[in-house]
């Protein structure tokens, strides 16, 4: 991508591959991708944020694409994932950062905002609830059980890796809709994603984020008192119920929720103009 420079950054005992763009003296925005993406999932957001004067970094998170993939499920507990990002923030700025996260990246962002708020100025969470809402509401809300059933499957050893690798990563491709939506994803985009998934050890590392859940990754009850936030939510998300979004807004008093019609879990790809507008509007007006 034009204007994006990739580098390797040591943080929290590992090395992360980081895409960086924008003026070095601009306010720092950290973009955190979710499963099964990598830094390139923010391709529609980086330039508008840079054009608005921000310094933007988008890491491949631990276990993804070109970043380190430590062995063992315990290496993917949410406190560890959070500390990776704290290390990045402190290397790129002496000030507080703005963190924008989608899916699992949003879970890390929420956890950072709830447990180490001194590093954040603002949080924007895209189609991801506060982790403690996810943990406490899901067992009491049967419609979410089916939506989350894949998480139980991911706990199995080896079998999920084999199934995700079948037919040239067809399951992951279809989960995002890469090959089915040429208006959103070019053939180059599809190739980039599949190359990321093919990295040695990547599938196991990516799945270990989920496997760490059974080891108490979310055992801590982080505060609902977070930094100022905006939550953006595609109404047609087939993985996460809108109830989780509403419960997050109810419990977390320092922000607000915006629903977007005709958008799914992958809203940052489907409605980039709207997402970018909602991000920049919030950052400028609050």
Curated annotation (Swiss-Prot):
The keyword Transmembrane helix belongs to this UniProt entry's keyword annotation: no
Superkingdom per UniProt: Bacteria
Active-site residue list: 103, 210, 265
Domain AB hydrolase-1: 27-272
EC number: 3.-.-.-
Keywords, alphabetical: Hydrolase
Gene Ontology MF terms in the entry: hydrolase activity
InterPro entries documented for this protein: AB_hydrolase_1, AB_hydrolase_fold, Epox_hydrolase-like
Family according to the record: Belongs to the AB hydrolase superfamily. Epoxide hydrolase family.
Name the record gives this protein: AB hydrolase superfamily protein YfhM
Source organism of the structure: Bacillus subtilis (strain 168)
Gene label: yfhM
